[in-house]
Amino acid sequence: MDKLIAVLVLITLGSIMVNVGVHYVPVGGAPAAMATATGVGTGTTQLAAGSGLTGLITAAAMSQKPFLVILWNGALGAATMMAITMLVGNFIYVYGVGCPPCSAKVDKDPITGWDQEAYVTPGTEGHGIPTVSFVSGILGGLLGGSGGAMVYYALYKVLGMSAALAGILAMGFFYANAVLASYNIGGTIEGYHDPKFTRLPKAVVCSLVFGIVASVIAYYLSTLM
């Protein structure tokens, strides 16, 4: 029973952290790929899953270390992947397309205080990844990576699953939460300053329910092994 409670807490909390982290990630979808919207030019699930997979790999590399080391390593792996992706994206937007990173959803960047309106191309929602979106993306990577690492720890250390099976299940849980967040966002999001970020409570409830169900399934799956 103690093991079930531990798994329930870790997987549910990890799922919520992943879901919340996805809402911080600046995703612009197809419009961003054409430099007509702020964010990285890909889908929410793809970008979140990419950073999550990186976080799981870095967490698994420290699987014999204490809990906090695994957690922090997963967070750093996902955040580093997000930072590199956004930085390379900005290089392409600035030096390839020739447009400055800016947002049409705020008059001034909440972090730097720089004016945005003068740099937004008419008819677009901004372009590139401005400072506030960049910082938001790193925060999302830290949350998502640590959440994924928490799920991996529950499966590998607490339930005693093999590293391969724990990694596969943790990735599946990550994808499920990324899809839940994607449906909740409904398209593109620039980060924590985006009006869509206020939809977060609904996503947390959905992730809570999913985490409980996933915990029970994972626990009883481990008893069959």
From Swiss-Prot:
BP term (GO), one: one-carbon metabolic process
UniProt-annotated location(s): Cell membrane
Organism for this UniProt entry: Methanopyrus kandleri (strain AV19 / DSM 6324 / JCM 9639 / NBRC 100938)
Matching Pfam families: MtrD
Membrane topology, record value: Multi-pass membrane protein
Catalytic activity, EC: 7.2.1.4
Stated role: Part of a complex that catalyzes the formation of methyl-coenzyme M and tetrahydromethanopterin from coenzyme M and methyl-tetrahydromethanopterin. This is an energy-conserving, sodium-ion translocating step.
Name assigned to this protein: Tetrahydromethanopterin S-methyltransferase subunit D
Transmembrane regions listed in the UniProt entry: 5-25, 40-60, 67-87, 132-152, 161-181, 204-224
Entry annotated with the keyword Iron: no
This protein's pathway: One-carbon metabolism; methanogenesis from CO(2); methyl-coenzyme M from 5,10-methylene-5,6,7,8-tetrahydromethanopterin: step 2/2
Catalytic activity: 5-methyl-5,6,7,8-tetrahydromethanopterin + coenzyme M + 2 Na(+)(in) = 5,6,7,8-tetrahydromethanopterin + methyl-coenzyme M + 2 Na(+)(out)
Any single GO CC term annotated in Swiss-Prot or TrEMBL for this entry: vesicle membrane
Alphabetical UniProt keywords: Cell membrane, Membrane, Methanogenesis, Methyltransferase, One-carbon metabolism, Transferase, Translocase, Transmembrane, Transmembrane helix
Location (main, coarse): membrane
Family listed: Belongs to the MtrD family.
